[in-house]
Amino acid sequence: DGPWAGRGLDEIVSGDARRVLGSALAAARRGRFPLLVKALDASKNLSIQVHPPDGYASVHEGGGPGKTELWYVADADEGAGVLCGLRDGVGREAVLRALEEERLPECLRLIPVKKGDAIFVPAGRIHAVCAGVLVIEIEENSDITYRLYDWGRKGRPMHRGKGLDVTDFADRSDPLLAKRWEEGDGFRTARLARMSSPEADLPQIVLQRALDPVVEQP
């Protein structure tokens, strides 16, 4: 109903970005809706990749935004996991050697996951979803991906130079997010992460009973 009836978010934002996003975010995102939500169902290991921060993307990728992601694990086979972040003691030279010798997975943290887990993937953190994991991926609306390793599969381009440039080798934060639940009336909520660009809270909300509808009076 109303003037936006039947229109998608991309149409609404492109037609009136300043009204929907605010002036600052509309300018920074060039009129694009700032977030994407995808479902990734990994029947086999996905490529190992890394995304740039905004500053690098602005200089080297024609002004486009970088990308930070959050994965919510919707389902996972027993024993399945994700690769996310560098193992302790692994620096640039170790990653470079591993790339040359086609053994990059050895450099990364293998994190077992189960349904309901949340994984934070900021720009600069090397990562891959492994076989047997279904994630809901909430990410910045950017197409910039630097692929580093593809499990011996041929035919897709690698971007190892830029990937090494943007990798945060000082990053040792735990990608698996701890949840602090707050109880509400018939629901509970936990803030999974806070993204700074665009500025957004990413909550998880669990309904414990049906909520009474709010009826607006004419």
Label for each model-derived stretch:
Residues 105-112, 133-218:
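Fe(II)/2-oxoglutarate
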Residues 1-90, 150-193:
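Transition-metal
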Residues 68, 130-133:
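Short edge beta-strand segments in beta-sheet-rich domains
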Residues 33, 44, 66-69, 115, ...:
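A generic structural signal for well-ordered coil/turn residues at beta-strand boundaries
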Residues 56-57, 79-84, 90-95, 121-122, ...:
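Short, well-ordered, mixed-charge alpha-helical segments that flank or form enzyme active sites
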Residues 90-120, 142:
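Active-site glycine-rich loop that binds ribose-phosphate moieties when present
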Residues 48-51, 112-131, 140:
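Conserved metal-binding segment of the jelly-roll/cupin
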